[in-house]
Amino acid sequence: MTYKLYYWPHIQGRGEVVRLALEYSKSKYEDVARNVSDPDSARTLITEFLNNNNGVNLPFAPPFLIDGSTVIAQAALILYYLAPKLNLVSDKQDERLFAHQIQLTVTDFLMEVHDTHHPISNSLYYEDQIEESKKRTINFIENRIPKYLKYFETILINNKKISDWLVGSQLSYTDLSLFQIIEGLRYAFPYAITKLESKFPRVINVRNKIRDIPAINAYLNSNRRIPFNTMGVFRYYPELNKK
């Protein structure tokens, strides 16, 4: 069975945590919109599905995954569905729920990242809200990044007698998502994250260990990994990254 992932073909965005899980597990999947050469046609392919009233469990927005006749939307729910199939979560119910809790926190964090460059409205261009973005980013860097990273670091400390991972004794999809967070912060806020990393050694250890996994390393060095750019969740703007 080949999974079909629907997400915007030009960004990592919220769909990247799903791609990382599929790549790590070496699953057969089709990144559907990326197989369409024309960007406008790729967007149309997704929007036509979203506008289709055909009785399926209709997603509100991408990412969504199709597995046979099953349609699942929202990155955290997609991962909750996939993880047992891909051996990316424990078979213990309490650990599965905790992993899902962590992933929902990741979702919250990604929204806060997005709001640094779109603090007023998604319908406005970044250039239309630069001054508000500067204000939002100052608070995000000084308060929100440390708060989230401390949370992840604390989870890792609490689990240190069992493993170096976030949940239980094995790598889970939450660790892959934490990797994506650090990669994104290094791209979008390199000066800020450089000052913070030494305070969260276990978080950085997770990032480093995942980077060295052959399947992940191969993915990162392939054309399947979309580069960070100015259209995704993590965006680099010099005026938001002042020393």
Q: Residue ranges of each PLM-predicted region?
A:
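Short amphipathic alpha-helices and their capping/turn residues within compact interaction modules
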Residues: 26-27, 83, 87, 150, ...
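Conserved alpha-helical elements of sugar-nucleotide-dependent glycosyltransferases
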Residues: 13-17, 202, 215
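GST-like domain detector, emphasizing the conserved glutathione-binding G-site
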Residues: 1-136, 237-240
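GST-like fold's C-terminal all-alpha helical module
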Residues: 94, 101-212
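Short, contiguous strand/loop micro-motifs
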Residues: 4-6, 193-194, 218
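Positions that flank functional sites
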Residues: 36-37, 171, 225
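C-terminal helix/juxtamembrane-tail motif
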Residues: 2, 216-243
